[in-house]
Amino acid sequence: MRAFVLFAVVAMAATMAVAEQCGSQAGGATCPNCLCCSRFGWCGSTPYCGDGCQSQCSGCGGGSTPVTPTPSGGGGVSSIVSRALFDRMLLHRNDGACQAKGFYTYDAFVAAASAFRGFGTTGGTDTRKREVAAFLAQTSHETTGGWATAPDGAFAWGYCFKQERGATSNYCTPSAQWPCAPGKSYYGRGPIQLSHNYNYGPAGRAIGVDLLRNPDLVATDPTVSFKTAMWFWMTAQAPKPSSHAVITGQWSPSGTDRAAGRVPGFGVITNIVNGGIECGHGQDSRVADRIGFYKRYCDILGVGYGNNLDCYSQRPFA
């Protein structure tokens, strides 16, 4: 399906995920948007801000606590999305025709979210709802089993797949830092369709699992699967901000961003995820599909969509 598409741009520009982003591994560089620099030279929020954090460990003021703003009151992500709402949003994920039937559980979603401080808990209630809607929308597009005349509509069929169909490559790029394990393939798996060894490696390191040796965990352990998607969501990959920073209003576009049409909103998240393929060339059905999921989920959660939903006129990030 679209498993390999998510990181295709990264493959064309290998420095995106192969080289470290900050700290001693990157000439002392600091992370954008006041993110922590982990001991391994990667930008993000918890767990990047723990032991060995190199810089901005409590935002741009130093220290050793997580950079993500203190979540608002009201509990974790379960206070925004109940089990019943989750089932309503991902209405047909357990349909008999879906490859992922029974895999993507509410409990796994909540458990994974609790490992990423700030996910679905940053800001006021509307901001929190909008983040969950945006995350589930982007990942629903990546895993959709819907079609135009599907029962309950195309946007009720997110999370139908958990791994790429018909993969013709093992997605192994030679890398000293993220070496491929013998006999393993790194095709798209999970909600974000994680692809390539140079993404499995840092994702696994961030969540404490060796995904280079055990990539199948992304399609067999639902909590690990959700965690890889949330790692992608919460992690900035310069010059891209994190999707979390965008949807929670923490990202301020630079002059270069504004000149490229990249302004805050759901559209720039699509640009982060797959802009090199989908953005900057006018109307695109894939962008429209992502927006369709997003609007449905916002409607279910009772929150406005915000502005700038598409990336039709945005230049992709370099």
Curated annotation (Swiss-Prot):
Keywords, ordered alphabetically: Carbohydrate metabolism, Chitin degradation, Chitin-binding, Disulfide bond, Glycosidase, Hydrolase, Plant defense, Polysaccharide degradation, Signal
Occurrences of domain Chitin-binding type-1 (ranges): 20-59
Pfam families named in the record: Chitin_bind_1, Glyco_hydro_19
Entry's induction text: By ethylene.
Record GO biological process: cell wall macromolecule catabolic process; chitin catabolic process; defense response to fungus; polysaccharide catabolic process
GO molecular function terms listed in the Swiss-Prot or TrEMBL record: chitin binding; endochitinase activity
Reaction equation(s) it catalyzes: Random endo-hydrolysis of N-acetyl-beta-D-glucosaminide (1->4)-beta-linkages in chitin and chitodextrins
Residues of the signal peptide: 1-19
SUPFAM superfamilies per the UniProt record, alphabetical: Lysozyme-like, Plant lectins/antimicrobial peptides
Positions annotated as active site in the UniProt record: E142
Enzyme's top EC category: hydrolase
Disulfide bonds: C22-C37, C31-C43, C36-C49, C53-C57, C98-C160, C172-C180, C279-C311
Catalytic activity, EC: 3.2.1.14
Role played: Defense against chitin-containing fungal pathogens.
PANTHER family assigned to the protein according to its UniProt record, in alphabetical order: CHITINASE, CHITINASE-RELATED
Family: Belongs to the glycosyl hydrolase 19 family. Chitinase class I subfamily.
Protein known as: 26 kDa endochitinase 1
